[in-house]
Amino acid sequence: MKPTPLPPISASAPDKTNGVSAPPPRQSSATSKVFASIRHALRRLWSVMTANRKVMAGSVIVSIFILVAVFGPIIIRQNPFAYTKDLVQPPSSAHWLGTNQGGQDVFVQLIVGTRSSVMWALITGLMVMVISVAVGLVGGYLGGVVDDALSVITNVFLVVPAFPLAVVAVEYFNRSSITIAIVVALTNWPWGARVLRAQTLSMRSREFVTASRAVGEKTWRIIFLEILPNEIAIVAASFITTTIQVLLAVAALEFLGFGDNRAISWGTMLYDAQTGSALFQVAWWWFAPPGLCIALLGAGLALLNFGIDEVADPRLRQLKRRVRRGKAVAA
Amino acid sequence: MRHVIRRIGIYLLAIWAAVTINFFLPRLAPGNPAEIVYDRLAQHGAVNPATLKALELEFGVNTTDPLWVQYISYLNNLIHGNLGVSTTFYPHNVTDIIGQDIKFTLVLLSVSVILSFTLGTLLGIVVAWKRGTALDTVLSSVMTFFYSILYPWLALMAVYFAFTIGWFPFSDGYDLSLTPGWNLDFLMSAAYHAFLPALTLIISTVAGWMLTMRNSMVTTLSEDYVLMAQAKGLRQRRIMFAYAARNAILPSVTGFAIALGTVVGGALLVEIVFSYPGIGYALFQAIQGQDYFLADGILLLIIVATVLMNLVVDVLYSVLDPRVRQERSA
């Protein structure tokens, strides 16, 4: 089963256009070509984003969260730690999502926390992808002893339960977001590495790889500039899955109190709610929103992923007509 | 046969890696367990430098032995089932504490994993069979949402509703006025207390099973042998289960092995939120009390148990998929 690679999303055209354009009116022509290629890339991105209902719903949800993460804290400009005298107040016009035990505004915390949660989920997801791409592609392409060694390591880490290991490991180091990110990255890479290795194995014997080897291209160039771009769809899909996983893992670790207590994120909000016994004060507005945000962002990412799967593998599409025709043939 | 030997080799390596990580982690950390117990004893008075020396000797820390000698003696202790002494529950052995807590975790985990796998797989089969209908759309969307729910948050919500409505207990593993034993009162109480933790575990894991099964089932349904079965005029239920589901379940079984680690992690969180007296809660208490021996012992147990379960799943897989036995698939 080989999913067909998606059309490349990134704009790679500008580099090429610079060299091709004619010298005299260089400035204007080059810029217009750059604009044209940017427009082309955006149209490409748009067509990928609107490929089907799932991808569209997913992109809308994820985009909203990213926009809030980038601009939210700038727009509301309030200190999430500021104490007020309104302790544990239900939602009102002054405090949209009420206040917590310290009288801190939950809505402000939620918006500021979005930045930390989204950012660290993406950073950690990226770290995981770098490890899995390196291990999977190098092992799959080189084969032999290197592959055997990397496969064994991958399989060993695949068997070891990630979360308990992360909990124990995090305990031994100082509490900061970067510690959590590193520990989560080190315990979550094997799945992606395994998928990418399998794909690289089948890629290795393709003609374009043989050709670049015959031309005498360097091994690292073949792996990362020839094979990797052809696996970008799988890399993207496993980046999304990984990001969901690490979003949950990071939040769970923060919920257990391993987070950085000078920063605010969805996970630390839940930790505060748990330790401040929000439950027994019936302060639902304190602990419900961060969890809902995590689930929504996760669902958005999952929708994006399932949608991409459907684009890549037409069999997963919900084509009623085709099924009926199948039955008609059967009958 | 080669496949089985290879897998067993990987499992042995995994256990060895876990043991080694377990050995090195506490030694990388600042402070040592002897000092922690010493400090705790010091609060009650009656200590002298000799006490610290004795504790260090007992815990085997801060010695002048080279690292490899410590490593060998650590392995030797492990083989004899000696995981050290708990510092939070001093002077109880780690092995005793684990032995006492593991029963709760085992029952809670096995019941909820089996229920969730069965339910999720059945739902996946039905939804794939009726794909494109309203049932599929609704269930798939709801499950996509459940799929990415933060487990402890779900548990918090459950505790919240249990607290406000007052239907189910939301802490402890049984009614503390009863003495644990094989009598009806205790078992009923334990089941009553386990209901909410099990329910939240099932809700948070059922989505994964359903979505895996649905995707794999949809792929299988477009196979020629399913068309053939339909052409033969076999009953729908027979095609659904004996033809499509029988072949579609393989990825779920593989997923089962991988999900075990996740489920164990979920159980850890469930026990913490519900203060459920299993090993997950014990691990949490151990970490909060900087009880390295107990934390490492529990981590080791969790890893070994997951590895063993993987082995079981491998055997099950080779029973379900004849191709594995004939070594045609990796």
Task: Please place each PLM-identified region on the residue numbering.
Chain A
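Generic hydrophobic transmembrane alpha-helix motif, especially the helices
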Residues: 96, 100, 127-131, 140-206, ...
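Glycine-rich helix-loop "coupling/hinge" segments at transmembrane-helix boundaries
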Residues: 158, 169-172, 199-200, 241, ...
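C-terminal transmembrane helix and the adjacent membrane-cytosol boundary/short C-terminal tail
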Residues: 184-187, 233-241, 284-331
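N-terminal signal-anchor/first transmembrane alpha helix
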Residues: 30-81, 150-153, 231-232, 298, ...
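Short membrane-interfacial helix/loop motifs at transmembrane-helix boundaries
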Residues: 32, 70-108
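Transmembrane alpha-helices
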Residues: 115-131, 220-252, 301
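Transmembrane alpha-helix signature in integral membrane proteins
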Residues: 106-141, 296-297
